[in-house]
């Protein structure tokens, strides 16, 4: 955890700074989970109310029925986004592409590390 004020906490994974709601003790260690259904993908950088926007590499694409799980990597951060097959086709996403990963500060679920 880098900073926590006004019910907004910033934390770092590798060199990537992310934001979540809630109060945490600065310099504390936490675990982070973001549900794949909460992650939005965009080809271009967009102006949005979402606090978290990461430029990531598409590592793998797994088709599951009418959905697609897009496996993403940026620095030490690994994420999976679940999108519809139609959206994947419209965005023309392929392994090796770089894409913007977007999620709101309310999306990450943080787990406090016990001492």
Language model region names:
Residues 1-2, 58-61, 72:
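A structural signal for short hydrophobic beta-strand segments in well-ordered beta-sheet cores
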Residues 3-8, 61-67:
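Short, conserved beta-turn/loop elements at beta-strand boundaries and strand-helix junctions
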Residues 9-14, 33, 69-75, 82:
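Short, acidic/hydrophobic/Gly-rich beta-strand patch recurrent on exposed beta strands
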Residues 7-9, 28-29:
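Conserved active-site beta-strand-loop modules that form the wall/rim of enzyme catalytic pockets
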Residues 15-61, 82-115:
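Glycine/charge-rich catalytic "coupling/switch" loops of P-loop NTPases
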């Amino acid at each position: 955890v880098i900073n926590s004020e006004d019910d907004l906490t910033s934390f770092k994974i590798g060199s990537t700074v992310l934001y979540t709601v809630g109060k945490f003790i600065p310099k504390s260690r936490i675990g982070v989970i973001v549900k794949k259904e909460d992650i939005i993908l965009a080809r271009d950088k967009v102006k949005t109310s979402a606090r978290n926007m990461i430029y990531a590499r598409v590592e793998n694409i797994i088709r599951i029925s009418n959905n697609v799980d897009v496996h993403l990597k940026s620095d030490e951060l690994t994420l999976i986004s679940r999108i519809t097959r139609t959206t994947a086709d419209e965005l023309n996403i392929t392994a090796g592409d770089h894409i913007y990963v977007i999620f709101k500060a309310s999306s990450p679920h943080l787990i406090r590390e016990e001492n």
